[in-house]
């Protein structure tokens, strides 16, 4: 039986602003990796990734994380998937996340273009795309734009229908921006200080620990590796989905959380229009983070779909 680390869950409540602390400096966010102007020819960025080896005769599995996430969210799952399927597995940091470059362009078109640059470079075309939430939208768009790149598609608890951003998402960013940490303190102490400040508004320890995975030390000062300014500015864009006319005719699985409300029955018609071969499957007792709430059920569903 595989052992899985429990991941975080986003609370439904709205976060407030946190209070500044004396004798400390604001935690900045790394901006030295900026790529230039928004929509500058949609040139792909050199994404950070981790590739696990496997059978090169089979299409690789590519995991795309959600908002505020990183490739490390799938570490355990990726290793288990290699063992179970024998395939190569790629995990990727989206632009403005993890160790990938920052850019003022947070559009799905840009994120799709990044993958169109990376996947052929690694010899992973065609591949199986598995995207959660924001990563699911990127995966859908790439499949619609470049069906030759995507052998089959798994979309986790998101749909091609735009939604209004929850106020808690903007509050996550505001809470992180408000954190202040003294210079040149040990990383363990910095995490404790940040956790304490976030705790006044982020009540669930799981979500705090998830956000704190983005806290890094640069030159003796602590920074958020997320591009918080761009993400805050483009939340509306991130919550929408680009209008598309031509469908993706490849095999597609929409894997939904039984306790999640992200994908409504009213979305199914648009799912069927754009993905006519779509299977829609629900994992009971799972929330939005299906792969962390019910990892074994998630693995079973994906591997069955690949069979």
Swiss-Prot record:
Q: Which reaction does it catalyse?
A: 1-octadecanoyl-2-(5Z,8Z,11Z,14Z-eicosatetraenoyl)-sn-glycerol + H2O = 2-(5Z,8Z,11Z,14Z-eicosatetraenoyl)-glycerol + octadecanoate + H(+); a 1,2-diacyl-sn-glycerol + H2O = a 2-acylglycerol + a fatty acid + H(+); a 1,3-diacyl-sn-glycerol + H2O = a 1-acyl-sn-glycerol + a fatty acid + H(+); 1-octadecanoyl-2-(9Z-octadecenoyl)-sn-glycerol + H2O = 2-(9Z-octadecenoyl)-glycerol + octadecanoate + H(+)
Q: How does it assemble?
A: Interacts with OGDH and DLST; this interaction maintains the functional lipoylation of the 2-oxoglutarate dehydrogenase complex.
Provide the tissue specificity: Expressed in white adipose tissues.
**Annotated EC:** 3.1.1.116
Provide the transmembrane region boundaries: none
Instruction: Sum up the protein's function in the record's words.
Output: Catalyzes the hydrolysis of diacylglycerol in vitro and may function as a key regulator in lipid metabolism, namely by regulating the intracellular levels of diacylglycerol. 1,2-diacyl-sn-glycerols are the preferred substrate over 1,3-diacyl-sn-glycerols. The enzyme hydrolyzes stearate in preference to palmitate from the sn-1 position of 1,2-diacyl-sn-glycerols. Maintains the functional lipoylation of the 2-oxoglutarate dehydrogenase complex (OGDHc) through its interaction with the OGDHc by preventing the formation of lipoyl adducts.
Q: Which UniProt keywords apply?
A: Hydrolase, Mitochondrion, Transit peptide
A Pfam family recorded for this sequence: Abhydrolase_1
Q: What happens when the gene is disrupted?
A: Homozygous knockout mice lacking Abhd11 are viable and only a slight but significant reduction in body weight has been noticed in males exclusively. In addition, less abdominal fat deposit is observed. Mice show some eye defects, including iris synechiae, melanophagy in the iris or the ciliary body, cataract (with reduced lens size when advanced) and retinal atrophy. Such ophthalmologic defects lead to blindness in 9-week old male KO mice.
The cellular location(s) given in this protein's UniProt record come to: Mitochondrion; Mitochondrion matrix
For this entry, the transit peptide stretch runs 1-34
Q: Locate the active site.
A: 133 (charge relay system), 229 (charge relay system), 288 (charge relay system)
Similarity section:
Belongs to the AB hydrolase superfamily.
- Note the InterPro entries from the entry: AB_hydrolase_1 (IPR000073), AB_hydrolase_fold (IPR029058), Epox_hydrolase-like (IPR000639)
Q: Which domain of life is it from?
A: Eukaryota
Query: What Gene Ontology cellular component terms go with this record?
Result: mitochondrial matrix; mitochondrion; oxoglutarate dehydrogenase complex
Gene name as annotated: Abhd11
Q: Under which name does UniProt file this protein?
A: sn-1-specific diacylglycerol lipase ABHD11
Enumerate the SUPFAM superfamilies for this protein.
alpha/beta-Hydrolases (SSF53474)
Query: What induces or represses expression of this protein, per its UniProt record?
Result: Up-regulated by rosiglitazone and down-regulated by high fat feeding.
**Which GO molecular-function terms appear in the entry?**
lipase activity
Top EC class of this enzyme: hydrolase
Does Repressor appear among the keywords? Answer: no
PTM info: Phosphorylated.
Sites of the modification N6-succinyllysine?
A: 79, 196
Query: Where does this protein come from, organism-wise?
Result: Mus musculus (Mouse)
């Amino acid at each position: 039986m595989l052992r899985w680390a429990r991941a975080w869950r986003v609370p439904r409540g709205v976060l407030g602003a946190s209070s500044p602390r004396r004798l400390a400096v604001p935690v900045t966010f790394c901006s030295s990796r900026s790529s230039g102007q928004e929509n500058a020819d949609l040139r792909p960025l050199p994404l950070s990734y981790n590739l696990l080896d496997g059978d090169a005769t089979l299409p690789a599995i590519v995991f795309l994380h959600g908002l505020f996430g990183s490739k490390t969210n799938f570490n355990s799952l990726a290793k288990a998937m290699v063992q179970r399927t024998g395939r190569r597995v790629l995990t990727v940091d989206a632009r403005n996340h993890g160790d990938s470059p920052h850019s003022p362009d947070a559009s799905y078109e840009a994120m799709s273009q990044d993958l169109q640059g990376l996947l052929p470079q690694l010899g992973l075309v065609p591949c199986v795309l598995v995207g959660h939430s924001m990563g699911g939208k990127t995966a859908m768009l790439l499949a619609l734009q470049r069906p030759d790149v995507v052998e089959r598609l798994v979309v986790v608890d998101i749909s091609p229908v735009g939604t209004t951003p929850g106020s808690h998402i903007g509050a996550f960013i505001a809470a992180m921006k408000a954190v202040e940490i003294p210079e040149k303190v040990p990383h363990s102490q910095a995490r404790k200080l940040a956790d304490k400040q976030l705790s006044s508004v982020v009540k669930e320890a799981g979500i705090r620990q998830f956000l704190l995975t983005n806290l890094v030390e640069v030159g003796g000062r602590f920074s958020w590796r997320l591009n918080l300014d761009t993400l805050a500015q483009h939340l509306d864009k991130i919550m929408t989905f680009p209008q598309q006319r031509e469908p993706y005719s490849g095999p597609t699985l929409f894997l939904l959380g039984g306790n999640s409300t992200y994908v409504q029955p009213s979305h199914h018609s648009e799912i069927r229009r754009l993905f006519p071969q779509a299977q829609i499957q629900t994992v009971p007792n799972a929330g939005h983070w299906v792969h962390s709430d019910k990892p074994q059920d998630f693995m079973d569903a994906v591997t069955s779909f690949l069979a």
